[in-house]
Amino acid sequence: MRLLSFIYLVWLALLTGTPQVSATDNGKTSDVAWDKYSLSVKGERLFVFSGEFHYQRLPVPELWLDVFQKLRANGFNTISVYFFWSYHSASEDVFDFTTGAHDIQRLFDYAKQAGLYVIARAGPYCNAETSAGGFALWAANGQMGSERTSDEAYYKKWKPWILEVGKIIAANQITNGGPVILNQHENELQETTYDSNDTKVIYMEQVAKAFEEAGVVVPSSHNEKGMRTVSWSTDYKNVGGAVNVYGLDSYPGSLSCANPNSGFNLLRTYYQWFQNYSYTQPEYLAEFEGGWFQPWGGSFYDSCASELSPEFADVYYKNNIGSRVTLHNIYMTFGGTNWGHSAAPVVYTSYDYGSPLRETREIRDKLKQTKLLGLFTRVSKDLLKTYMEGNGTSYTSDDSIYTWALRNPDSDAGFYVVAHNTSSSREVTTFSLNITTSAGALTIPDIELDGRQSKIIVTDYSIGSESSLLYSSAEVLTYATLDVDVLVFYLNAGQKGAFVFKDAPADLKYQTYGNSNLSALETSQGTQYSYTQGEGVTAVKFSNGVLVYLLDKETAWNFFAPPTVSSPTVAPNEHILVFGPYLVRGASIKHDTVEIVGDNSNSTSIEIYTGDEHVKKVSWNGNLIDTRATAYGSLIGTVPGAEDIEISLPSLSSWKAQDTLPEISPDYDDSRWTICNKTTSVNSVAPLSLPVLYSGDYGYHTGTKIYRGRFDGQNATGANVTVQNGVAAGWAAWLNGAYVGGFSGDPDKVASWEVLKFNHSSLRSRDNVLTIITDYTGHDQNSQKPIGTQNPRGIMGATLIGGGNFTLWRIQGNAGGEKNIDPVRGPMNEGGLYGERMGWHLPGYQVPESALDSSPLEGVSGAEGRFYTTSFQLDLEEDLDVPIGLQLSAPAGTEAVVQIFMNGYQFGHYLPHIGPQSLFPFPPGVIYNRGQNSLAISMWALTDAGARLEQVELKAYAKYRSGFDFNRDWTYLQPGWKDRTEYA
């Protein structure tokens, strides 16, 4: 393989004369340019270390900054963001970009404030396991025609969206002082016909033109759906529709929640793929596995150890570095919550995703491990221009080790990425590595790899203005150019490391402070310093001024290099070094004080190196702490945690209950409901009976729908009913108030066909009423047959058995349908249960005296429904971040549909018979940490066995003393109850 690589390089040199390639731009702006090595922003090469974030899944704008600060602190310089059309458009030609969490200008402002670039992804189609893939639900009833093509019907629907959201994206481009550096066209749209007249090609041209019309000038991108097709690259069969920067999506883990030993098989073909299909462009992994979604009936994220492992981040992300990737987006980095009815049927309420940052905004070990790579790429400028020197198993003394060898053609810096050839191996292997350096060919002995570990070995690596490494078998975490050059290494505890300074004096003296003792060995290439990594922080001060920190991996997890600048790019002299806390959000130096803002769960020691001899004091979240100075120039102290604070959450009591299924009664007045009188549908899927009963045809798209069908006579013995509301969605039916059957939902079935059997004694000679109540788990994605996102929802067909026909059907759904009567929470928050339509879930609702004193623990004894409400007070300390959730459980065999509403937000869809989720977190802003909270639970039984819960309990996940303000006035996000009688 090394010989082949050499031949390739000779051929490349003959062909081009030089390995350098001048930067290319799109002709609209030179602020963002690219070549085959990397992206350049404002003339500076950038390693795009990006995390996927969906603001819709966290409907509290202030918390976007919380997440962004955590990403910035953990080495990210960019976020990738979907903009869901569905969230901003409740009805045709109506857009909301200003109300509550719909205000995306705040998203851009917070990203800029946090020091993050933005990759904008506005579709029109997004997927992201969101309902209808992000299409506006009003358009997903069939009226779009052939979606994701040049179909005129589709074009007329999506173009206004792109023009509106595009204007805001354009206003926030890097060219206008904003953070947007790339703009994605569409999403995972597979190009299968390379013909300029192909409908998809025309469509991609239309999307490009629409963004251009909106004023977007930054380079365009796209994300290939795995290595299945080759789509929209200027370097491969470009007949139109191609983007400027080609990207690839890859989820290669093949991990199993049930079996942590399965999967973990690396793909080592990214380099070849990009060389074949986008060779003039930098390698861009537009979505790379940060976790994986879980379906109804699957596993819950917290129990999926294989997806949560920091080893995954270590091995897989470094493999991408070895493949020459320089644009790297982790999907998801923060998943959030599918609150309301925003989920596609393939996922449940939680969209935690097993991501590095938990749904509760807590930092997982996976994020701590990811940080080690993020901080490394931030300072490793030579990594941004490399060629593939070679790869394979011949670089080491043990052929069980695979090596990527990258070389910078200008500086000759080398990057050797080593891992087990069998990536799932748990063997501990010691080997030597053959390297090429400015001092010639060398061999580094005694490199150790634990199972499922990878390392980046550097050669001729600059660590400051006057210092370089000839090589190091310890991994570089970061370096800083301060009063002296400061270098930070890390290794697993107990592993051996060695490094050699380049062109350093032979008689260097050093002093060690800590548990890792250094030894020096003179070689022909210089002095090799060797050590065995101990636990904690070890500092080594050399007589030439260089300061080296040696950290074990777990200590490195709690190391931060907070920038002293606000820009996403951070030079080695623009950050300081902090060891110890759970999180460092930011740092600044004012006179003789370094001011640090951060979070801590437990009291910890803290060490700060600023390189400023005038700094004598440390403040933590505004409070000075006692410190002592070390002999090598740092300050050490202790920062407080929250371990001594008792969190006492109230028990939930004083429940009130009301009937939320009054429509079961044949005497219920439905005269104001929508009459189902259509004999044709806008949908191309033909109904199984008439009139059309698709809910979307009548303007009801989300949540529970209720149908009431009337017929005369006593001849009917039953009814054939087919319902399609997404996998796991159940439904139930009542004839004249008597339960007659239904379907409890199945995670493997998108629709159900059931025969309802009527009891003759329940029939009346005139005006029989069949009431059908349906659950809903979302609109399908584009890939679901027959017509993707436009697959109908509701009753597909309903016919009587034994004679007679239905004489009238009426439907009721969410209050107001497409009117969006609660614009703050938006068009997907509510469904059509009576309690929802009446606003019983909203703050300020006054329960009537007629309400029952009953709790969800009592439940219902038959096929009934109840809406339970209570309130509780929280009074957490002001400087605490305490993620809080609601724990539910139900007796085995319970078949019911349960929803949780916290201060009006539907933040839990619980199906106890399907699962897996039973603990539902609420972010601050949805829940008041210091104030009054309104909690509502709707529950209806899917069978006549009834339903109840056996646990309804507030639960604290953890507690952190925080420098972020989580206790604000959230009133603007929680509009209260208003009379809704008209929607009865």
Curated annotation (Swiss-Prot):
The lineage of its organism: Eukaryota, Fungi, Dikarya, Ascomycota, Pezizomycotina. Cleaves beta-linked terminal galactosyl residues from gangliosides, glycoproteins, and glycosaminoglycans. It comes from Aspergillus flavus (strain ATCC 200026 / FGSC A1120 / IAM 13836 / NRRL 3357 / JCM 12722 / SRRC 167). It is found in: Secreted. This is Probable beta-galactosidase C. The keyword Secreted applies. PANTHER family: BETA-GALACTOSIDASE RELATED (PTHR23421). Its EC number is 3.2.1.23. Residues 1-23 form the signal peptide.
